[in-house]
């Protein structure tokens, strides 16, 4: 499903542990290409349904293994480099994403990169919240910056242990 502007609807997943570190995964076959889990939204799915399906497929986690803390308000878009743009119809020039911030409720051992099909990642680790911004492939960097910035207040609530009020930490 690609919109009239050529963007494919997608979900991005920022999964944080109780210490505020986020799951960072290396793509299979990439030249040391690391990213957050993400994936397309099918025509019959809501963004939240796609989130849970992608979470299961990519890192083997179920809905009960996580808690949704926040989601970005609008779509965040990035354009693919020209060499990655699909030329056949419908032409896909990039992705438009809803980003979810999740809290991991399960033990680390619940992460299973084999998931429900061919693996997309071959390694994962916990990293600091802002670390991915300097490491992700350049064409995704601005979307990562915007998503991390928008979701930083609910992320910081993990560190303080305080509830959010109108999207802000009580610290």
UniProtKB/Swiss-Prot annotation:
UniProt keyword Metal-binding present: yes
EC number: 3.6.1.-
Motif (Nudix box) on chain: 39-60
GO molecular function: metal ion binding; pyrophosphatase activity
UniProt keyword annotations, A-Z: Hydrolase, Metal-binding
S-S bonds: none
Gene coding for it: rppH
Top-rank taxon: Bacteria
Protein name: RNA pyrophosphohydrolase
Species name: Teredinibacter turnerae (strain ATCC 39867 / T7901)
HAMAP family: Nudix_RppH (MF_00298)
């Amino acid at each position: 499903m690609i919109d009239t502007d050529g963007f494919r609807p997608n979900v991005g997943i920022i999964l944080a542990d109780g210490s505020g570190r986020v799951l960072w995964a290396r793509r299979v076959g990439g030249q040391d290409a690391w990213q957050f889990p993400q994936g397309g939204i099918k025509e019959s799915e809501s963004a939240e349904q796609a989130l849970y399906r992608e979470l299961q497929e990519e890192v083997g986690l179920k809905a009960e293994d996580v808690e949704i803390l926040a989601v970005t308000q609008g779509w965040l878009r990035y354009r693919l480099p020209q060499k990655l743009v699909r030329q056949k119809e419908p032409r896909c020039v990039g992705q438009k994403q809803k980003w979810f911030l999740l809290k991991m409720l399960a033990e680390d051992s619940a992460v299973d990169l084999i998931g429900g099909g061919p693996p997309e990642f071959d390694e994962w680790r916990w990293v600091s919240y802002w670390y991915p911004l300097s490491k992700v492939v350049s064409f995704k960097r601005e979307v990562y910056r915007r998503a991390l910035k928008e979701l930083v207040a609910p992320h910081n609530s993990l560190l303080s242990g305080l509830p959010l009020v109108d999207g802000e930490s009580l610290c």
